[in-house]
Amino acid sequence: MPKYPLLGMTLTELQSVTKDLGMPAFAAKQIASWLYDKKVTSIDEMTNLSLKHRELLKGEYDLGISAPVDEMRSVDGTVKYLYQVSDNHFVEAVYIPDEDRATLCVSSQVGCKMNCKFCMTGKQGFTASLTANQILNQIAALPEWDKLTNVVMMGMGEPLDNLDEVLKALHILTASYGYGWSPKRITLSSVGLRKGLQRFIEESECHLAISLHSPFPSQRSELMPAERAFSIKEMVDLLKNYDFSKQRRLSFEYIVFKGVNDSLIYAKELLKLLRGLDCRVNLIRFHAIPGVDLEGAGMETMTSFRDYLTSHGLFTTIRASRGEDIFAACGMLSTAKQEESNKN
């Protein structure tokens, strides 16, 4: 009989566990401390619980931490990890070390429903949403855990399409009884879903990144079908109701496609669209994927685009591309091969 994972449980849920097992009320905080602060590898290591209570706990629960089943290493130091989340399903997470920081790109779903034209995860289709345990396991089981400084929810899947479990995972990451991270170390990236965006802004203090890619609705809907359900104009109008002028950061991701969205008219329309918002724009180089007739703009074009926006008051950066040689860069994550091979 499968055991229930402790990783991914809130303090309230741990209190229910200890109550059901006849353990003292304070034992829930002890378990949370061992799990999220001391990062034990077995229930036996929870030595301030009595032997009897540890045995009771082991009878129905395990830590719920599973090591990656595979990894790929890039020449630039990026590492892509493959996690098995169930018998037949897998997700990828990407560890990106830098001089002064180390970031983990975390997945929220197996596949994705959004079907963005430029993304391999979308081409894979949607299989399942991850639980808070499966989201946090990508972090807790990371071999480089002790070096990690930042988490970005920019891996496989649309986080706002799995908002209950994503918010639960983010709560545990930032709660004092949990990992105790500052929300300023975490960024959630989304295409922008009407039903989830407002809730995320109001229930989380983590940074927000919106996938933009075109300021023109008709073109954006071709690149990103989600535009048809919740337009970028409506999204911007909603975002203007909130204060992003302090520590919380709002950014817009913009993949620059050659001859598609890289001309001056696009830069001018971006300025018009985002006027009045305290935000930044991150320009991203497109990484070619099979079967997609798009090409990335050159660095000279991207630099000119950035300089125009910045000179007109919109802070803009060019995001460094990492892990392209192992299909770990933006838009390149997919576990379609593993999913298919496990069916056979």
From Swiss-Prot:
This is Probable dual-specificity RNA methyltransferase RlmN. Signal peptide: none annotated. Disulfide bonds join C105-C330. The lineage of its organism: Bacteria, Pseudomonadati, Bacteroidota, Bacteroidia, Bacteroidales. Specifically methylates position 2 of adenine 2503 in 23S rRNA and position 2 of adenine 37 in tRNAs. InterPro entries: Aldolase_TIM, Methyltransferase_A, RlmN_N, RNA_MTrfase_RlmN, rRNA_lsu_MTrfase_RlmN/Cfr, rSAM. The active site is at E92, C330. It is found in: Cytoplasm. GO terms for cellular component: cytoplasm.
